[in-house]
Amino acid sequence: MYALEQKILNEGIVLSDQVLKVDAFLNHQIDPVLMQQIGKEFAARFKDTGITKIVTIEASGIAPAVMAGLELGVPVIFARKYQSLTLKDDLYRSKVFSFTKQVESTIAISNKHINAEDKVLVIDDFLANGQAALGLIDLIHQANADIVGVGIVIEKSFQPGRDLLLEKGYRVESLARVASLTNGQVTFVIE
């Protein structure tokens, strides 16, 4: 997605050959116009799959997921990373490891919001090692729902997440595929 790639080039900050900081428009400050374009792009790519729900993980996946949900006319469920006082019983739970934060978290969604009739699109802000996506997929499988695909805003293609998801048979649509962050430069996969 050209607009996203330009935003990454202009406002993204390469912190290392593994880490890209995009807090100017995605995961701290949010660019609503760009998020709307991202939502439209996900909707266009997955429009014929019969989606009934979108599942993401708090917090940075929420904005792109909500915009896609708005375009597709479906609800968005975000998995919580901590136990809340209002989220107690009847939960689907999974463990995920965050590459960026280097911590393992338990994520959960209420079983009241997803069931075996659902066709679910997973959306997340980044794809690195694929652990967040696999954790969300595990939650969806616990509900016996179908997964129509995984939508990623920024994929770090030099890490194994995409291949891991493809090997497991999931459709992966990434709006920006980063080939390298070497020498402080963002290079994209040419498709």
From Swiss-Prot:
Q: What is its main location?
A: cytoplasm
Q: What is the lineage of its organism?
A: Bacteria, Pseudomonadati, Pseudomonadota, Gammaproteobacteria, Moraxellales
EC number(s) reported in the record: 2.4.2.22
Which reaction equation describes what this protein catalyses?
A: XMP + diphosphate = xanthine + 5-phospho-alpha-D-ribose 1-diphosphate
Name of the protein:
Xanthine phosphoribosyltransferase
Instruction: Show the SUPFAM superfamilies listed in the entry.
Output: PRTase-like
Binding site residues for xanthine: L20, N27, K156
User: Which positions in this protein are listed as binding 5-phospho-alpha-D-ribose 1-diphosphate?
Assistant: A128, N129, G130, Q131, A132
Name of one Pfam family that matches: Pribosyltran
Under the heading InterPro entries, the entry gives:
PRibTrfase_dom, PRTase-like, Pur/Pyrimidine_PRTase, Xanthine_PRibTrfase
Q: Which CDD domains match?
A: PRTases_typeI
Give the GO biological process terms: purine ribonucleoside salvage; xanthine metabolic process; XMP salvage
List the pathway annotation. Answer: Purine metabolism; XMP biosynthesis via salvage pathway; XMP from xanthine: step 1/1
Q: Which family does it belong to?
A: Belongs to the purine/pyrimidine phosphoribosyltransferase family. Xpt subfamily.
